[in-house]
Amino acid sequence: MDKLIIEGGYPLKGTVTVSGSKNAALPILIASILANKKVTLHNVPQLRDIRTTIKLLEILGCTIQQTEQCIELTPGTLQHEAPYELVCTMRASILVLGPLLAKLGKAKVAMPGGCAIGARPIDLHIKALEKMGAKFTLKDGYLIGDCTKLKGTHIYLDFPTVGGTENLLIAASIAEGETILENAAQEPEIEDLARFLIACGAIIKGHGTNVIHIQGVPSLNGCTYSIMPDRIEAGTFLTAAAITKGELLISGCPYKELEAIINKFMQMGIHIEKRECGIYVAPIKTLKATDVTTRPFPGFPTDMQAQIMALMSIAYGTSTVNETIFENRFMHVQELARMGANIRLNGHTAIVTGVKELKGAPVMASDLRASASLVLAGLAAKGITTIQRTYHLDRGYEFIEKKLNAVGASIQRTNE
């Protein structure tokens, strides 16, 4: 099993390029099964979750060719079953539920897996698809759905679920009639999915707002499309520059989508400039404490909570983090504490009192973003940090140690 060995204390300096967005690429890949002609996707990151999705789509009947960041998907005879051995490793697999029902009128999908960061229930997906005419049973760990034809309707989501909005957006694009999604998630990745579907011939209005109108069409065509940059990877690199008191130009970085993150970093005393080719982070001497509450977009993203907590751990003063999106998303706290961080938990709130320095230690990643926070802490720590379970990191970061080493980090990957 791979592990990362990080020698901390080196300020980062140089230019790092942001990869394509994992959270946009996954639903777009899955939506491609609705196309009746070849789909070509560019800027697709080379990640473990992408490879899992490709395997799943091949089992469902698609032919896929991949060359680095380009994927060509050719539709075939679509199958309706998503097997446990793939779905159990990646939560986004549940996104095949809506499109399979929309195109085939039936679906058999194993209950999903992925990061262990709380219940993350799929009941909102199921309730909404039932309102569109689907019926579901649960048998032997599989969710089995069937319908004559999904029909457009008015759906109010009790919570602006990202996965639920994506599932319904894809399914409604070839449903019969108009679907209105109210209280829809507004994340940029959903906008990217909508733009892809529109490029394939879907009729969608209001994407990027909390009310989306989808007029179903009989079928979707193929298209050529480029995946948006990964705002969470960009935010992670911003944090890497600040935590090492380094100087980075983050190329291909979406400024508008990062405003909630950038505003918090500026409150911490970090100097950030918008440049034509990306975002510049200047060296800093002292980090200030701040308070963060995770919210759906355009609020501060839960996927950056662990990373900013690593930064807070060496900031002057006491910071707080309120996690409102997922339960059990503080599993990185005890690992940061092993490195000397002073963090106290009170329910869904973490109180972080900054320390003078972190110290290298053996730590273990528990999920994707927790693993990123440990890498960041390791970059800043005095001494050697060893991170086990790097497969979590590989689910969402493309060549992270290579990118960081290229700007001055000292990270070695070993297999034991």
From Swiss-Prot:
Annotated Pfam families: EPSP_synthase
Principal cellular location given in the protein's record: cytoplasm
Pathway: Cell wall biogenesis; peptidoglycan biosynthesis
Positions of the catalytic residues: 115
Any one GO biological process: UDP-N-acetylgalactosamine biosynthetic process
Keyword Nuclease set for record: no
HAMAP family: MurA
Family stated for the protein in its record: Belongs to the EPSP synthase family. MurA subfamily.
Name this protein carries in UniProt: UDP-N-acetylglucosamine 1-carboxyvinyltransferase
Primary gene name: murA
